[in-house]
Amino acid sequence: MPDYLGADQRKTKEEEKEDKPIRSLDEGDIALLKTYGQSTYSRQIKQVEDDIQQLLKKINELTGIKESDTGLAPPALWDLAADKQTLQSEQPLQVARCTKIINADSEDPKYIINVKQFAKFVVDLSDQVAPTDIEEGMRVGVDRNKYQIHIPLPPKIDPTVTMMQVEEKPDVTYSDVGGCKEQIEKLREVVETPLLHPERFVNLGIEPPKGVLLFGPPGTGKTLCARAVANRTDACFIRVIGSELVQKYVGEGARMVRELFEMARTKKACLIFFDEIDAIGGARFDDGAGGDNEVQRTMLELINQLDGFDPRGNIKVLMATNRPDTLDPALMRPGRLDRKIEFSLPDLEGRTHIFKIHARSMSVERDIRFELLARLCPNSTGAEIRSVCTEAGMFAIRARRKVATEKDFLEAVNKVIKSYAKFSATPRYMTYN
């Protein structure tokens, strides 16, 4: 159909179309648009999430949980009268030890308790304690009037031993450890497989290895692997430095070892890492003065706990040392330390991997030849390669650059590997391992 409108009229019609008012969306249209892309159960899931948030809010209000500078509940939730009544009704208890249970199978058993530095008493249980909760040798809380047993207490453990437990997992993973692929596989066979797949050992009828010795020159990644194991496993991780068990008074070191394994037995699964074990695990000798007798007693207690009369339970033990030649043969035998893993100097592939691991968190140029840098660092440990990367960053900072170049790495190799070679103890320690 021919268009009889002129250009001006056609332009006027187009302007009317453009000037036509735009209708805004109402609430129904917006709600409909929001439903696009949602699943069938989105509304029900959203309703359940809202209900959970409301319940959490009510629980926090009832329990008085609220962030404040003092850490106290709001004053509106204080109940001073009830607190005073609780203080008057609950008297402080005295710590005693149950030494013997008389007529344990009868309906009215009696308990002999020993109050330290005071006396022994034959007492009954209070109404709050069941007879099955009390065992011989257990610490209990008794009142000061009738000396009735009101509460069972956990075993006494030295605070220094409790502080050895690692609460927060380290941030080191197996991908952060370079040049130790074979060692990590052997370590995971001993630590992770028995915890995650114990049925494999039951089907074969063997007991998994319970002790591992990590030995090698300084800086080869022994402690780093232990930190990666602590990050990987959900078991309780206890870290002990060998020098912490060397105490001034007679019997203190052996007592700490006993309490350490007592605490470990209370856990579902536990991993104990002894770093620098040569501080207490040296071979026994008589120097005539008796200076090392206490250290030897501590080592004998450790030997007994590793494979003595009492079963060790689900406790794995890792030990690390730079001098395996100084350790006592009784500590090294199978049954106590079943597997010995050597951490030798990394090869070319391992050194390249270590360079890439440390450069991963640095601002570096692209196309840096890490294999060339690894070839320029023969017989170097992982710690020395890390020092090379740090020095390369220092050269970049000195030149007021934001990125480290390959030239910085080459200068760092000359400084750390070549200039500091006279300070390196790796050749000497290689003769010990």
Swiss-Prot record:
Disulfide bonds: none annotated. One of its GO terms (cellular component) is proteasome complex. InterPro entries: 26S_Proteasome_ATPase, AAA+_ATPase, AAA_lid_3, ATPase_AAA_core, ATPase_AAA_CS, NA-bd_OB-fold, P-loop_NTPase, PRS7-like_OB. ATP binds at G216, P217, P218, G219, T220, G221, K222, T223. It is found in: Cytoplasm; Nucleus. GO terms for biological process: proteasome-mediated ubiquitin-dependent protein catabolic process; ubiquitin-dependent protein catabolic process. One of its GO terms (molecular function) is proteasome-activating activity. Residues 1-23 are annotated as: Disordered. Keywords: ATP-binding, Cytoplasm, Nucleotide-binding, Nucleus, Phosphoprotein, Proteasome. Residues 8-23 have a biased composition (Basic and acidic residues). The keyword Nucleotide-binding applies. Phosphorylated. Dephosphorylated by ublcp1 which impairs psmc2 ATPase activity and disrupts 26S proteasome assembly. PANTHER family: 26S PROTEASOME REGULATORY SUBUNIT. Belongs to the AAA ATPase family. The 26S proteasome is involved in the ATP-dependent degradation of ubiquitinated proteins. The regulatory (or ATPase) complex confers ATP dependency and substrate specificity to the 26S complex. This is 26S proteasome regulatory subunit 7. The lineage of its organism: Eukaryota, Metazoa, Chordata, Craniata, Vertebrata. The gene is psmc2.
